[in-house]
Design a protein with these regions (language model features):
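ATP-dependent adenylation/nucleotidyltransferase module used to activate substrates
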Residues: 1-118
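Peripheral terminal appendages
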Residues: 25, 85, 89-98, 119-174
């Protein structure tokens, strides 16, 4: 309910464009609102983003397991947003059971925008539709999270049930 159909259409269009450069692309759209609402209700505001990112990694790992995919690739770049610090990436990685590739990791925003223009994703990517990462942004996100603190914070959440329900309710687009 928090992410519009237009936002979903934007992601589908981006996948279609990126698909021109790959053999085959399958888009999995995972409903994240219930996870976010549970995190917001039970965790500290400054930890929302990193706990949400840990859930995204868990969902990606579980989906990878079910689909027999050996690795995860993300679009993260050091320092581009508060959660993409070295500490934030390490805390996110902590829940992954497979390699995580980050081809944009050392690029700055201008480099990434140049690539987006080159592959024709830029104009679509800047469309102003809110997504799950922009709606629930804390005022002061934690930039130096620690694994042990996140493990303690996450004890309040039913991680396995939330991850499984999200994957069970996902939509698949080919």
């Amino acid at each position: 309910p928090y992410t519009s159909e237009r936002a979903k259409d934007k992601v589908k269009e981006l996948a279609k464009i990126v698909g021109r450069y790959t053999e085959k692309i399958t888009l999995y759209v995972v409903p994240f609102t219930e996870i976010q609402m549970d995190i917001i209700e039970k965790c500290r505001e400054d930890e929302l983003t990193i706990i949400m990112r840990r859930f995204m990694m868990r969902v990606a790992c579980e989906l990878s397991e079910r689909k027999k995919i050996q690795s995860i690739t993300t679009g993260e770049s050091i320092g581009q947003v508060a959660s993409q610090t070295m500490e934030g990436l390490m805390v996110s990685n902590d829940v992954s059971d497979r390699p995580v590739f980050r081809p944009l990791i050392a690029m700055d925003k201008e480099d990434i925008m140049d690539i987006a223009r080159d592959i024709d994703t830029y104009e679509t990517s800047i469309l102003p539709y809110e997504d799950c990462c922009t709606i629930f942004v804390p005022k002061h996100p934690k930039t130096k999270p620690r694994v042990k603190d996140m493990i303690i914070a996450e004890r309040k959440l039913d991680i396995e049930a939330l991850v499984n329900k999200a994957i069970d309710e996902m939509e698949t687009f080919i």
